[in-house]
């Protein structure tokens, strides 16, 4: 049979063969242990979709461009990737979704790096394809169980911080570059003192001439302890441990642990998955929370027909390890994007996510008991967005207002107060059964009557129109 082409009796036929003879298997039944991938394929003109899909399966598993005699020394049937289904994308000419199944044995256990090297390592430069995008991955429990996952997860984080029943509040310290360590620490203290739970190093604050990392760590730790003492709440500052080498990164993490701070931070795409997984292991062993920033993600995920969708990068992060990850804000975006963002927010938080193509989820994903990751909404949000954010993200999230805190006309601490008051008002209104989508502006206005800080913030940013009226259509 053409399927079992590895028997010696067949003889060795040299030459270039169509990929689809070996790698396109529409009658294949996927196994529970297979890693499944959904690729959006745009073939070059004249290349049939089956051949393109099979080429993806081949190039990302056992195939090479010609038949080689060493194929006879292994069982291709056991190790090859298989393109088992192809469907056209509605409304797009010459776009197809190719589903590929990879046998589990092709991957090293506990290595996101190896998983990506195999699945997306070579195939994106393939000539027969005009463009290729990895839309989704199904990680089988047999594989996800080989990963530690997030250092702590959502529940343990709440227990460590003693904060329940509401989203957490953060703020990125700006200007991101140029402050001295002492002034930086002062800004941190003011925000935490005003009522935020966290402040954050910007992703590109590492260790520059104007502020070396040790100085920053020391001044921020001082700010944290001072704010904790004055407010009676646990506070944190995401100290960015990202560095040029893994050794230096771990050195910074060790110093943070010695200072006794609760949380550090890493840029997982620029730092790389290997570094990130090492850091996540260190964080779990030493009781540090790990905040993940996705700097560079748009380079990879912005094109709709080429690259890797962010939901795949988010799944990979949950396996590699991180307690928070930035995931977009949803507010003021289009409906469709909103559903898709909520799709990967669920992939980060929940144990079991059912297949739902309307939210961009191509496969049912069962994480078994891997801890969840808190999604972080950050970027261009302010107090008027608070009802929408509370409604959309729910309690298990971190809402980060950078300019929305530091841009307050009276300063950082009042800006923090305004955000905290707005958040508490929204949470209370929700718990009393009010509809945040419809009454959001009203709730904020009521709260601003007894909080001058909030009133000032409302005045600066004015009301915004919520672009969603009907939340129930989801």
UniProtKB/Swiss-Prot annotation:
Subcellular location: Plastid, Chloroplast
Superkingdom field: Eukaryota
Single GO term (MF): monooxygenase activity
Protein name listed in UniProt: Ribulose bisphosphate carboxylase large chain
Modification N6,N6,N6-trimethyllysine, positions: 13
Cofactor note: Binds 1 Mg(2+) ion per subunit.
Reactions this protein catalyses: 2 (2R)-3-phosphoglycerate + 2 H(+) = D-ribulose 1,5-bisphosphate + CO2 + H2O; D-ribulose 1,5-bisphosphate + O2 = 2-phosphoglycolate + (2R)-3-phosphoglycerate + 2 H(+)
Primary location group: plastid
Cofactor: Mg(2+)
GO cellular component, one term: chloroplast
Quaternary structure and interacting proteins, as annotated: Heterohexadecamer of 8 large chains and 8 small chains; disulfide-linked. The disulfide link is formed within the large subunit homodimers.
Residues annotated to bind substrate: 122, 172, 176, 294, 326, 378
Presence of the UniProt keyword Oxidoreductase in the record: yes
Note: The basic functional RuBisCO is composed of a large chain homodimer in a 'head-to-tail' conformation. In form I RuBisCO this homodimer is arranged in a barrel-like tetramer with the small subunits forming a tetrameric 'cap' on each end of the 'barrel'.
Top-rank EC class of the record's enzyme: lyase
Natural source organism: Dendrophthora clavata
Pfam families (alphabetical): RuBisCO_large, RuBisCO_large_N
Positions of the record's site feature: Transition state stabilizer: 333
InterPro entries, per the entry: RuBisCO, RuBisCo_large_chain_AS, RuBisCO_lsu_C, RuBisCO_lsu_C_sf, RuBisCO_lsu_fd_N, RuBisCO_lsu_N_sf, RuBisCO_lsuI
Record-listed Mg(2+) binding positions: 200, 202-203
Modified residues (N6-carboxylysine): 200
UniProt record, GO biological process: photorespiration; reductive pentose-phosphate cycle
EC number(s) stated in the UniProt entry for this protein: 4.1.1.39
PTM annotation: The disulfide bond which can form in the large chain dimeric partners within the hexadecamer appears to be associated with oxidative stress and protein turnover.
UniProt keyword terms in alphabetical order: Calvin cycle, Carbon dioxide fixation, Chloroplast, Disulfide bond, Lyase, Magnesium, Metal-binding, Methylation, Monooxygenase, Oxidoreductase, Photorespiration, Photosynthesis, Plastid
PANTHER family, per database record: RIBULOSE BISPHOSPHATE CARBOXYLASE, RIBULOSE BISPHOSPHATE CARBOXYLASE LARGE CHAIN
């Amino acid at each position: 049979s053409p399927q079992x082409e590895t028997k010696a009796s067949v003889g060795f036929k040299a030459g270039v063969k169509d990929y689809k003879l070996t790698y396109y298997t529409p009658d294949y039944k996927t196994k529970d242990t297979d890693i499944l991938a959904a690729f959006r394929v745009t073939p070059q003109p004249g290349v049939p979709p089956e051949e393109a899909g099979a080429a993806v399966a081949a190039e990302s598993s056992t195939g090479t461009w010609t038949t080689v005699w060493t194929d006879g020394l292994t069982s291709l049937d056991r190790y090859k990737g298989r393109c088992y289904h192809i469907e056209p994308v509605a409304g797009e000419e010459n776009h197809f979704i190719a589903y590929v199944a990879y046998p589990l044995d092709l991957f090293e256990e506990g290595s996101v790096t190896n998983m990506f090297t195999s699945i997306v390592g070579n195939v994106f430069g393939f000539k027969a394809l005009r463009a290729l995008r990895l839309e989704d991955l199904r990680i089988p429990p047999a594989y996800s169980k080989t990963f530690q996952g997030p250092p702590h997860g959502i529940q343990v984080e709440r227990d460590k911080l003693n904060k329940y029943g509401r989203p957490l509040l953060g703020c990125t310290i700006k200007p991101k570059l140029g402050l001295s360590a002492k002034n930086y620490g002062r800004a941190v203290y003011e925000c935490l003192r005003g009522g935020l739970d966290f402040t954050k190093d910007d992703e590109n604050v590492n260790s520059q001439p104007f502020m070396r990392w040790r100085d920053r760590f020391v001044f921020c730790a001082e700010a944290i302890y001072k704010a904790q003492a004055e407010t009676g709440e646990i506070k944190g500052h995401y100290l960015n441990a990202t560095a040029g080498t893994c050794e230096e990164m771990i050195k910074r993490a060790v110093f943070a642990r010695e200072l006794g701070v609760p949380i550090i931070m890493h840029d997982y795409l620029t730092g790389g998955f290997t570094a990130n997984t090492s850091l996540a292991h260190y964080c779990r062993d030493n009781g540090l929370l790990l905040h993940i920033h996705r700097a560079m993600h748009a380079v990879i995920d912005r094109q709709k027909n080429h690259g890797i969708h962010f939901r795949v990068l988010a799944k990979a992060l949950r396996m590699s390890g991180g307690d928070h990850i930035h995931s977009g804000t949803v507010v003021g975006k289009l409906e469709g994007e909103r559903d898709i963002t909520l799709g990967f927010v669920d992939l980060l938080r929940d144990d079991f996510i059912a297949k739902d193509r309307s939210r961009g989820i191509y496969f049912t994903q069962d994480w078994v008991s891997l801890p969840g990751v808190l999604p972080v909404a950050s970027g261009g949000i302010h107090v008027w967005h608070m009802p929408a954010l509370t409604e959309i993200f729910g309690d298990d999230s971190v809402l980060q207002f950078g300019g929305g805190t530091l841009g307050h006309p009276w300063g950082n601490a009042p800006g923090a107060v305004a955000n905290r008051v707005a958040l508490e008002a929204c949470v209370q209104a929700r718990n009393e059964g009010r509809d945040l989508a419809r009454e959001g502006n009203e709730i904020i206005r009521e709260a601003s009557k007894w909080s001058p800080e909030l009133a000032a913030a409302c005045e600066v940013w004015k009301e915004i129109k919520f672009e969603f009226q009907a939340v129930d259509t989801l």
